[in-house]
Design a protein with these regions (language model features):
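Solvent-exposed, flexible loop/coil residues
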Residues: 14, 103, 155
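Accessory C-terminal segments flanking Radical SAM cores
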Residues: 135-171
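Gly/Ser/Thr-rich beta-alpha loop segments that engage phosphate groups in nucleotides
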Residues: 34, 105, 157
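Flexible glycine/acidic-rich beta-alpha junction loops that bind and position SAM and/or redox cofactors
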Residues: 72-74, 93-114, 137-150
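Radical SAM/AdoMet-radical enzyme domain recognition
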Residues: 1-98
Length: 171
């Protein structure tokens, strides 16, 4: 089971239980540098993700990343430096989701432009090619639909828990 999480509840007792179960992988939400990440996810979130990565790596638990890219963080979260940091922490795969302005704090100005979406398609294809020496396999939730038979949401293979605790078929 792949569980997408902000990682704030991952601690040692939790990791021990996950190891005992043996069938859970995690996708950790991260959106760039400490300041960029915490501005969107809340103070201390970046440090919580870094700590969770250390624990998951220590316990040998499979994990990747869930990265929301915006018009403001797109180049930072696809930079060689960022990708290498993720690999050093133990993540070698992840999903990129482009920002969708939904909810009470929607910010349409954070939506990637068409040119930025094209950059993502090209950058992800490059990172997956043999030209790249970064051992990280990125997937683009929206732009890789052809490889997974279309959107995986909508009652097929995905649902999320919203901030009110309700299960929904899509974001």
């Amino acid at each position: 089971f792949a569980i997408y999480t902000n990682s704030t509840l991952i601690d040692e007792p939790f990791c021990k239980e996950v190891v005992r179960l043996g069938n859970i992988a995690f996708m950790l939400s991260i959106e760039g540098s400490p300041s960029t990440n915490d501005a969107r996810r809340g103070d201390g979130h970046y440090d919580a993700v870094m700590h969770a990565m250390d624990l998951l790596k220590e316990y040998g638990i499979l994990f990747g990343t869930s990265i929301c890219y915006t018009s403001a963080n797109l180049e930072a979260v696809t930079s060689d430096h960022f990708m290498r940091m993720l690999c050093e922490k133990g993540a070698h795969f992840g999903f990129y989701f482009h920002y969708m302005p939904v909810g009470n704090d929607a910010a349409p100005e954070l939506m990637p432009s068409p040119a930025q979406r094209k950059y993502m398609i090209d950058r992800i294809r490059y990172l997956r090619s043999e030209k790249s020496d970064i051992p990280f396999y990125p997937m683009d939730f929206q732009n890789d639909g052809e490889f997974v038979g279309g959107c995986i949401a909508g009652g097929r293979n995905y649902f999320h828990i919203n901030s009110a605790g309700d299960a929904e078929p899509c974001v």
